[in-house]
């Protein structure tokens, strides 16, 4: 909604819900397993009013390998959109389960999802984006 110059914003203009919004937060990393079977997953909380999404509010857990598969599928599904890279893999001699490494990866995954989910073509036309963000039973094999 355009605002006229010199006229102060009304309360409704300042605090009303935007026409369409999509908010994503990656939080609450959890490490599971023992030894070589250890992995970390992250909670993805999504709030939206975009009709392409089935739920207004959702929370799912995903691990890094899920993000890798999601990115590959998204790249194939959306050939007209440049999909950003994921945060890099952890170096061999780095403890990938240290708090610092987990937080750096969480921040990188957050940036990745903000860019991807912020793209108008993907927001409204990507079935895999909606499923990845909202379906707790999401499985890459459904999309390959």
UniProtKB/Swiss-Prot annotation:
Which Gene Ontology terms of cellular component type are present? early endosome membrane; Golgi membrane; retromer complex
Question: Entry's CDD domains?
Answer: PX_Grd19
User: Topology relative to the membrane, per the entry?
Assistant: Peripheral membrane protein
Report keywords, A-Z: Cytoplasm, Golgi apparatus, Lipid-binding, Membrane, Protein transport, Transport
Q: Name the SMART domains for this protein.
A: PX (SM00312)
InterPro entries attached here?
PX_dom (IPR001683), PX_dom_sf (IPR036871), PX_Grd19_PX (IPR042138), Sorting_Nexin (IPR051074)
Location relative to the cell:
Cytoplasm; Golgi apparatus membrane; Prevacuolar compartment membrane
Q: Which residues bind a 1,2-diacyl-sn-glycero-3-phospho-(1D-myo-inositol-3-phosphate)?
A: 63, 65, 89, 96, 105
Tell me, which GO biological process terms does this entry list?
Answer: endocytic recycling; late endosome to Golgi transport; protein transport
Q: Source organism's superkingdom?
A: Eukaryota
Q: PX domain: which residues?
A: 20-139
Q: Family assignment?
A: Belongs to the sorting nexin family.
Q: What is known of its domains?
A: The PX domain binds phosphatidylinositol 3-phosphate which is necessary for peripheral membrane localization.
Q: Any idea what job this protein has?
A: Required for retention of late Golgi membrane proteins. Component of the retrieval machinery that functions by direct interaction with the cytosolic tails of certain TGN membrane proteins during the sorting/budding process at the prevacuolar compartment. Binds phosphatidylinositol 3-phosphate (PtdIns(P3)).
Protein name, per record = Sorting nexin-3
What's the source species for this entry? Cryptococcus neoformans var. neoformans serotype D (strain B-3501A)
